[in-house]
C-alpha cells in the first residue's frame, strides 16, 4: 500500500516509528509536511499539491496533526478524504475531539462517565459556579490549554474564586471541574485501535504535582485495567468517531471517569511503558480496512 503520514516533523518518535513500521511491512510510506500542502478545490476533481507535484495514488493516510494547526491540518485531511483516500482518523472526528467543550457535551449526552464539569466565560455568580460542581477543591482549566498548560488546582473556595477572576480578566473560556482526590495524582492512558484497547499505562504525577502529563514529568508504568475501564475507553473513542485514540481515565469511587479523548496520541510513552508494537497494530488495522469493499469512511470529506 502507498501510505501518507501527515506530520510537520519526520524526526518525532511517533512519526519515525510509523514510517519504520510501515516500511517493515512492505508499504511505501511518505511523510508529508501538513502546512506545505496546497489544495485545488476543482469541481469533481479535488487535488493536493506538494513540492510542485500532485499527490496521487495514496491508499491511506495517517494524520499526526498538532493542536496548533488543527484548522489547516483537518482541511488537508478532508481534501484527501474527498480524493477517496482512507483516513486512519477522519477530519470531522479530529475536529470533534479537539473541541474540549464539544467533546464533553457529546460524552455527557451518551452517558459516558466523567467528572462533574462547569463551563463559563463571565459568570455573574462565581460562588454558585463553584457550588455547582461540588465546591473546593476543584480544577480550573483554560478551554484551549494542552499538555497540562492552563490547568490549576484550587484547594479552597477562596483560591478558586481568585483563579476564576484571574481567568475572567483574560477574557478566556474556562472549565471548572470536580477534583478526584482518590485518583492520587494518577491517570490511565488507554490506547484504542479499532474498538479495542490494545495497551494501557498509568501516568503518575510527581510529588506535589497533580498533573500527570508526561510532558510535565509524570512517570509512566504498565497497568492492568478493569473490564469497565476498557469498555469506557472504547465507548469514548466511539462517541468521538475515532478509529485510533488515547483515552485518559481517572479511577474514582464511582467508576472510571473520562478526562480527555486524544485524536493524535503519542506512541513513545505507551510503547516504552508496555513494550508493545503499537505502530504495528495501527498498520494491522489499516490493512484490515483496506481489504473491505467499502472502508468505513463515514463522511467522505463532508465534515
From Swiss-Prot:
Binding positions (Mn(2+) 2): 260, 262
Keyword presence, Nucleotide-binding: yes
Domain ATP-grasp: 104-287
Keywords attached to this entry: ATP-binding, Ligase, Magnesium, Manganese, Metal-binding, Nucleotide-binding, Protein biosynthesis
GO BP terms in the entry: protein modification process; SOS response; translation
Enzyme class name: ligase
EC number(s) given by UniProt: 6.3.2.-
Cofactor note: Binds 2 magnesium or manganese ions per subunit.
Domain of life from the UniProt record: Bacteria
Annotated binding of Mg(2+) 1, by residue: 248, 260
Residues noted as binding Mn(2+) 1 in the record, renumbered to the chain: 248, 260
Residues the record lists as binding Mg(2+) 2: 260, 262
InterPro entries, per the entry: ATP-grasp, ATP-grasp_RimK-type, ATP_grasp_subdomain_1, RimK, Rimk_N, Rp_bS6_RimK/Lys_biosynth_LsyX
Binding-site positions, ATP: 141, 178-179, 187, 211-213
Entry coiled-coil feature ranges: none
Swiss-Prot/TrEMBL cofactor(s): Mg(2+); Mn(2+)
GO cellular component: cytoplasm
SUPFAM superfamilies: Glutathione synthetase ATP-binding domain-like (SSF56059)
Family: Belongs to the RimK family.
PANTHER family with a match to the protein in the record: RIBOSOMAL PROTEIN BS6--L-GLUTAMATE LIGASE, RIBOSOMAL PROTEIN S6 MODIFICATION PROTEIN
Protein name, per record: Probable alpha-L-glutamate ligase 1
Protein's organism: Hahella chejuensis (strain KCTC 2396)
Organismal lineage: Bacteria, Pseudomonadati, Pseudomonadota, Gammaproteobacteria, Oceanospirillales
